[in-house]
A protein has these predicted regions:
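Flexible, glycine/threonine- and acidic-rich loop/arm segments that mediate assembly and lattice contacts
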Residues: 1-241, 245-325
Length: 325
């Protein structure tokens, strides 16, 4: 099986996310739209003023995902009809896809553990925090039942203030409404998708199951594609009032029903002028390393130059403090 096909089978992000190939050396800086500037109304012979859309610069460097792999020459001979190198390539490609799914959410989000490494690309939690300002590292939002007019970050919704609350469909509806122009996807953990299924059935409005243009099964909630990211954990810390300190989040921490049992849910608009992936020099690549020095083995390098950027601050939103029960 080709590496590209393996990637889109294992990663819903890489199946649906549009990618922009970066062809110059300014690979880390991009413009994020903060306002379209609106439009003025004029009369005949009126004085016209200049009102431009507004932008802010953000940083989103590419990461290099991958590893070298090797296949022992004797092992290849003894493996019979199975192509040992092909199996290695397929498994490593799956690992690359799973790592992308993890970083797509958590990359450079926390100062705890391996996700703190600056060689990771920025994930959604970090980019949504930076919708407030380029230096913001927490999620300072508003209660989903209220109004976002006074919120520091309109793209952060809270299921409850300073505590967790069981997911209800009204939370998802408010989340989807926070994305402009219109959300294309809802992203959640497997556990929260199960909860959403149960809520939809109870409301007499089952989720719609369909196939996409590539023939892969898709689930829809209203107009949005709903997909599972298996790298999303259900152990997020509860907020302090309406602020979640994502910089201190520990991805590996145990679930604690009193304070660490929530799961972020995202609504995004995937588009080149919304949430988009970045790649350099093509997509995933397999590089021949030949015979390895000091070993009776052949080697290959699997690599993917990739990243993610949010080119409009209203193209992604997150619901925090929601639990399964």
């Amino acid at each position: 099986m080709g590496v590209a096909k393996v990637l889109i089978e294992v990663s819903p992000w890489l199946r649906d996310l549009p990618f922009v190939q970066l062809a110059n050396n300014n690979i880390s800086r991009y413009k994020m739209e903060t306002s379209d500037g609106g439009a003025s109304v004029h009369t005949v012979d009126d004085t016209w003023s200049t009102v431009n859309p507004t932008w802010e610069f953000r940083e989103a460097a590419l990461a290099i995902l991958g590893d070298n792999i090797s296949t022992d020459n004797f092992g290849e001979l003894a493996s019979g009809p199975e192509n040992a190198m092909a199996v290695n390539i397929e498994l490593k490609t799956k690992g690359v896809g799973q790592k992308f799914d993890q970083l797509a959410i958590y990359g450079q989000t926390t100062s705890t553990g391996f996700l703190a490494q600056t060689k990771n690309f920025k994930g959604l939690l970090r980019m949504i925090a930076e919708a407030e300002s380029s230096t913001t590292t927490d999620l300072d939002g508003w209660l989903y039942t209220g109004d976002d007019s006074s919120a520091n970050n309109k793209q952060v919704l809270m299921a409850a203030s300073g505590a967790s609350a069981t997911l209800v469909l009204a939370m998802i509806d408010a989340l989807v409404d926070s994305v402009r122009d219109k959300a294309t996807h809802i992203v959640m953990s497997r556990l929260m998708r199960r909860k959403t299924n149960a809520l939809a059935r109870a409301a007499g409005n089952n989720l719609v199951h369909d196939k996409d243009q590539l023939g892969f099964p898709v689930t829809r909630y209203g107009e949005q594609v709903l997909f599972i990211d298996d790298q999303i954990r259900n152990n997020m810390d509860d907020s302090t009032l309406l602020v979640t300190a994502i910089a201190s989040y520990d991805y590996e921490q145990a679930i604690n029903a009193s304070a660490k049992d929530t799961s972020p849910i995202f609504a995004v608009r995937m588009a080149e002028d919304g949430l988009t992936g970045m790649n350099g020099d093509g997509m995933i690549q397999v590089v021949e390393l030949g015979e390895l020095e000091g070993k009776d083995a052949k080697g290959k390098r699997i690599k993917f130059y990739c990243g993610e950027r949010l080119t409009n601050k209203r193209a992604a939103a997150v619901l925090m403090n929601a639990t399964f029960s």
